[in-house]
């Protein structure tokens, strides 16, 4: 039997795409790991995710044949391989999936023929090492393999419904309980009889001898709610082939970790950790996890405590813990990035572009976890030593909450020691924390439109892009105390819904408009405008006069000055977003915003505090775009057209088929439904007022614009002038004067410390003579006025040197409080413990304390009890000396 040719991982990628491009397929770039079209999915976990809407008929593409290499992730949610990574031959968090697709074009014959051609003619796999499976009733596929390809029937395995229900089979694919589905045929490679395991469908199929390399799915049915299968008018093909396991076969190795990409990463991990054993499981974990972490960051995910960011944090910390297991105490994980870029940068240019961002984000997380990893491991060791086989849930939660140990990391460590985590107890502790958070966050229930009322209403027509007031606004719904009513009287608090309105309803961070609604003998003061059910503008306010009824026709006008200030801030957030991405990196994404008349607040993803220099550059760039006075263009277009136009969409936002694009010169292009200036120059001035952290991985900038910015600068100048006058100078001299004052203060503090030391030395010089001899040990217990804990410790050191074998208690009294220091020196150390002695004294004066056998400190209340406690020290020492 001839050995198959060897192919590098890069060559396999190139061969696959070139082969199918030659068969008329459009080569489609990999979609990000964060799905853009499926909010129910945490990560892209298969090649078909980016084509899901095409298969469902919700999206049309310009091609009917496609091929791609899709990056995928399985860590978190239903598809989670994290616990197995590093311990098995083929489990990974990150992997690449080769796929070719037909959307109503070719079907089984071509899909099977091309798969066979690529495997046996391009990659030269021996035909006698390949075996296929088909769904047990798919005669067409069976006959194509037997008659067209020429595979013996003995190497074609029929797989039935092996999962307990009709069409529940390894060889029948379905997207959901209803919808597109169909049989599939899988191609397996036989590693040889020296490897344990049987063919698919046999009792030993879970062995490693026969490895699935390619799955060809034939979507030819539409499954109905009653379970019947209706033929699709245009059947489709969806194929998937794991690159890593294919590379293992084409490189003559048995496990995925032996392929070229992983060997290079494991080699780098070996060099960084000093571990020479390249089969070490921890090195495998590190090599796997650097790929997952890096590509998650490339696709806009940063470490945080929720959602996708928390999955990333878990993967990073699992890798760091495996480094810790290998004895690594220095920072190492981020140093893996250059090697990864060398290996995969050509296939994924976006990795090259984001290299610095990836390394910085990993380093920041590495530094953060390094602060608690060692302490957390000591806690785990202590808990494990007290437990039998189970780590209590409360302790697992403490490791999570205090030391940043994700529970699956704790479970991973426990499993290595033959233990497990009490997950029920952990979830109980987590739920208690959630309940506490929910209780703290409650401030009153919101108002919702009843479903039967929504069914009778048309979406509100918003007039506010062009108009600030409007007539003929018909009242279509009216809420009072959260309930629908037909009429309301003067003094009532109401929410008024009209068929049209110039009032902007709060959304996209922009606050709702306020203003006035009026009609014949009716006046309504509108304090706010909120959006209900995503499409109805509710005017929240109070009837000032008259009676309001359903069907009334009103006129409405917004508070023009308030809206005017708000739009300055909203337009400024777009310029700020663009400046942040330019200065900090394209990993920056909006995480939240508030656009109010008096200020703007912008939350964004970033992994470390912004320096003063970076803030200054960001502010200058925004103001430069303001001065350029770009025209602000608004375009309404289809979503895909908008993305092609260069518009930036926000992760997690749901957009309709048609979207509104806001373009500010060539600097900022975003999807936005808010109200804005007509030219950037209208903003006038942009001034950052604060920057800080909101949560892990999320920063916040607050700023003001226009007259608000001018007022802020004027107030800052006033304060600066006031401060300068206090120093007896002007604002240009204040820095020098403050520096001189600070230097003088430091000098005086040093002089004060020196004087205190001299005072303490003088006060304690004669104390040695007052020592009481107790069984050959000198005992001193005295009160020293005005001594703090530091002065007491210095006095203790001098007395120990002076007295030799001794037991010393010093009490420093000041302001009604007492600082205590106890020391044991020389021969009595084994029998008299300073911590016990200090605790004995502190308990008598309403205090507490403790420490080492030779030195302890504490405190308590000053009073008559102190003298009694100190007088009793010699007898206490005598008792303990025996």
Swiss-Prot record:
Signal peptide: none annotated. PROSITE patterns: AA_TRNA_LIGASE_II_ALA. Zn(2+) binds at residues 570, 574, 672, 676. It is found in: Cytoplasm. Pfam families: DHHA1, tRNA-synt_2c, tRNA_SAD. Keywords: Aminoacyl-tRNA synthetase, ATP-binding, Cytoplasm, Ligase, Metal-binding, Nucleotide-binding, Protein biosynthesis, RNA-binding, tRNA-binding, Zinc. It comes from the Bacteria. Its cofactor is Zn(2+). Its EC number is 6.1.1.7. GO terms for biological process: alanyl-tRNA aminoacylation; negative regulation of DNA-templated transcription. Consists of three domains; the N-terminal catalytic domain, the editing domain and the C-terminal C-Ala domain. The editing domain removes incorrectly charged amino acids, while the C-Ala domain, along with tRNA(Ala), serves as a bridge to cooperatively bring together the editing and aminoacylation centers thus stimulating deacylation of misacylated tRNAs. NCBIfam families: alaS (TIGR00344). This is Alanine--tRNA ligase. The gene is alaS.
């Amino acid at each position: 039997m001839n050995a198959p040719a060897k192919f590098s991982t890069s060559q396999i990628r190139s061969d696959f795409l070139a082969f199918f491009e030659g068969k008329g397929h459009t080569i489609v770039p990999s979609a990000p790991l964060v799905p853009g079209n499926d909010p129910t999915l945490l990560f892209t976990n298969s090649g078909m995710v980016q084509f899901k809407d095409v298969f469902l008929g919700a999206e049309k593409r310009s091609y009917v044949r496609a091929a791609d290499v899709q990056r995928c992730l399985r860590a978190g949610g239903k598809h989670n391989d994290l616990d197995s990574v590093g311990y098995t031959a083929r489990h990974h968090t990150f992997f690449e999936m080769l796929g070719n697709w037909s959307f109503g074009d070719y079907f089984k014959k071509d899909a099977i023929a091309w798969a066979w051609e690529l495997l046996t003619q391009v990659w030269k796999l021996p035909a006698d090492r390949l075996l296929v499976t088909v769904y047990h009733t798919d005669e067409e596929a069976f006959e194509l393999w037997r008659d067209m390809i020429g595979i013996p029937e003995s190497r074609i395995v029929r797989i039935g419904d092996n999962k307990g229900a009709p069409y529940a089979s390894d060889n029948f694919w379905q997207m959901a309980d209803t919808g597109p589905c169909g049989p599939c045929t899988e191609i397996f490679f036989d590693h040889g009889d020296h490897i344990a395991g049987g063919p698919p469908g046999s009792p030993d199929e879970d062995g490693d001898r026969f490895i699935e390399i390619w799955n060809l799915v034939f979507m030819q049915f539409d499954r109905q709610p009653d379970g019947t299968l209706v033929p699709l008018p245009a059947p489709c093909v969806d194929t998937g082939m794991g690159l890593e396991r294919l590379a293992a076969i084409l490189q003559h190795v048995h496990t995925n970790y032996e392929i070229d990409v992983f060997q290079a990463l494991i080699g780098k991990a070996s060099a960084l950790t000093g571990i020479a054993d390249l089969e070490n499981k921890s090195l495998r974990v590190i090599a796997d996890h650097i790929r997952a972490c890096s590509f998650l960051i490339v696709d806009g995910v940063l470490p945080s405590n929720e959602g996708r960011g928390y999955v990333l944090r878990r993967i990073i910390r699992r890798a760091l813990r495996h480094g810790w297991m290998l004895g690594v105490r220095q920072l190492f994980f981020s140093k893996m990035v250059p090697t990864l870029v060398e290996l995969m940068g050509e296939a994924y240019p976006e990795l090259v572009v984001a290299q610095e961002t990836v390394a910085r984000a990993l380093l920041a997380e590495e530094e953060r976890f390094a602060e608690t990893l060692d302490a957390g491991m000591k806690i785990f060791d202590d808990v494990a030593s007290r437990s039998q086989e189970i780590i209590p849930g409360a302790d697992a939660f403490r490791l999570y909450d205090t030391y940043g140990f994700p529970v699956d990391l704790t479970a991973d460590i426990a499993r290595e020691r033959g233990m497990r985590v009490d997950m029920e107890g952990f979830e109980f502790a987590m739920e208690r924390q959630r309940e506490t958070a929910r209780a703290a966050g409650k401030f009153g229930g919101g108002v919702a439109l009843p479903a039967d009322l929504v069914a009778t209403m048309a979406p509100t027509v918003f007039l506010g892009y062009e108009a600030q007031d409007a007539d003929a606004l018909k009242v279509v719904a009216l809420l009072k105390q959260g309930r629908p009513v037909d009429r309301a009287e003067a003094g009532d608090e109401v929410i008024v819904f009209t068929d049209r309105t110039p009032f902007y309803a709060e959304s996209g961070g922009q606050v709702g408009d306020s203003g006035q609604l009026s009609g014949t003998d009716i006046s309504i003061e509108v304090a706010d405008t909120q959006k209900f059910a995503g499409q109805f503008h509710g005017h929240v306010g109070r009837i000032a006069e008259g009676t309001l009824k359903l069907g009334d026709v009103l006129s409405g006008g917004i508070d023009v000055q308030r809206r005017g200030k708000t739009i300055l801030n909203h337009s400024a957030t777009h310029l700020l977003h663009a400046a942040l991405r330019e200065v900090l990196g394209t990993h920056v994404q909006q995480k939240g915003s508030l656009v109010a008349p008096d200020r703007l607040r912008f939350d964004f993803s970033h992994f470390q505090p912004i320096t003063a220099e970076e803030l200054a550059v960001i502010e200058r760039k925004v103001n430069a775009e303001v001065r350029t006075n770009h025209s602000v263009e608004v375009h309404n277009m289809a979503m895909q057209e908008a993305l092609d136009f260069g518009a930036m969409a926000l992760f997690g936002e749901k957009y309709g088929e048609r979207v509104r694009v806001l373009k500010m010169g060539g600097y900022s292009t975003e999807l936005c439904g808010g109200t804005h200036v007509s030219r950037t120059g209208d903003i006038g001035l942009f001034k950052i007022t604060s920057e800080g952290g909101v949560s892990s991985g999320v920063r916040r900038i607050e700023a003001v614009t226009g007259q608000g910015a001018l007022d802020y600068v004027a107030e800052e100048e006033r304060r600066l002038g006031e401060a300068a006058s206090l120093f007896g100078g002007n604002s240009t001299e204040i820095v020098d004067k403050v520096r001189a004052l600070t230097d003088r203060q430091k000098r005086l503090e040093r002089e004060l410390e020196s004087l205190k030391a001299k005072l303490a030395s003088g006060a304690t010089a004669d104390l040695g003579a007052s020592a009481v001899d107790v069984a050959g040990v000198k005992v001193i217990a005295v009160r020293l006025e005005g001594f703090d804990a530091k002065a007491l410790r210095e006095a203790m050191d001098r007395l120990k040197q002076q007295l030799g074998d001794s037991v010393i208690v010093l009490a420093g009294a000041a302001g009604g409080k007492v600082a205590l220091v106890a020391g044991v020196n020389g021969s009595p150390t084994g029998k008299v413990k300073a911590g016990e002695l200090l605790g004995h004294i502190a308990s008598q004066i309403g205090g507490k304390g403790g420490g080492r056998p030779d030195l302890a400190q504490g405190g308590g209340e000053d009073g008559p009890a102190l003298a009694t406690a100190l007088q009793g020290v010699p007898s206490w020492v005598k008792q303990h000396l025996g």
